[in-house]
């Protein structure tokens, strides 16, 4: 059986490419080494709740074309991301807004809040030398100490004084009472979970799970004229130029015999002492009324080969190494490299969709 396209990985990029190729009459085989489809947006039903197995995914975009495209596969609810920060039992609104400043300093007007931030920013003179100085120069010491420092150090596994200032280009400060984290026109969660959405994309397409492409590369390559590869690009080339680095995340998920644990989908723990970075309570993504609840504690961790890769470490060294791998990739005429791992890129979901659609256009039009 000969296929036009072998698509390696059933995450957003792979699923969209497969859907569009199939729609154009191409014969497509999708494979995934996991026992399930949907890549990192996979949701699993537990106690009637759609659990985001690989971390919280909240869809948001300003791109109308992307929104119109994705909503043909699922109806989206009106979920708005409004995280809460817990600093040693003190609760603050994220993003930083008037609720945050009122709680922090007792200020009531935007003018008072702006004056307080301006006063605290003066501590840093000249060019910020590291992330700590950068953050203080943007929002002042109080907000930095309580809401940025501990969280960031847990995330990156090193002190803020050793992290480069460019990691935090800007910190959104809102002198309003708006709790909506994303400034996006369109936002929500697919009702019934992301897995169902990806299932709809892959309707009528052959999918083989528990199939590791790199372990059976020759045999699988012989099945198709072209390959769309969405795995790690360095793994494709057997790491021959070296290993690209990632940050990883570990989740501890549990079912609780109560209807409400924290009253919000996401609570960030911004002190250094709490080992987890945040707790996700999954039912609130879909305004759940189930009698039980499912929570996931999220821990940032150093990544080593074999761990699940989450966030590319986009520093100079890794960027230069990726550029070398990209040259090798460009020389593979039979293979399209795409997605977060194939392009070693921190992609929001809407950007992955846009990239996949752009590639479809390039290939088929």
Residues covered by each model-derived region:
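N-terminal Rossmann-like FAD-binding beta1-loop-alpha1 element of flavoenzymes
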Residues: 3-30, 360, 364
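Short, solvent-exposed loop/turn segments at secondary-structure junctions
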Residues: 12-13, 35-36, 99, 153, ...
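Glycine-rich FAD pyrophosphate-binding loop
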Residues: 19-47
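Mid-domain catalytic core of redox enzymes
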Residues: 24, 214-328
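Short glycine/proline- and charge-enriched loop/turn segments
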Residues: 45-53, 178-181
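N-terminal FAD cofactor-binding segment of flavoenzymes
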Residues: 56-90
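Active-site/ligand-binding neighborhood in enzyme catalytic cores
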Residues: 85-93, 98-226, 230, 234-237
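C-terminal catalytic lobe of FAD-dependent flavoproteins
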Residues: 308-365
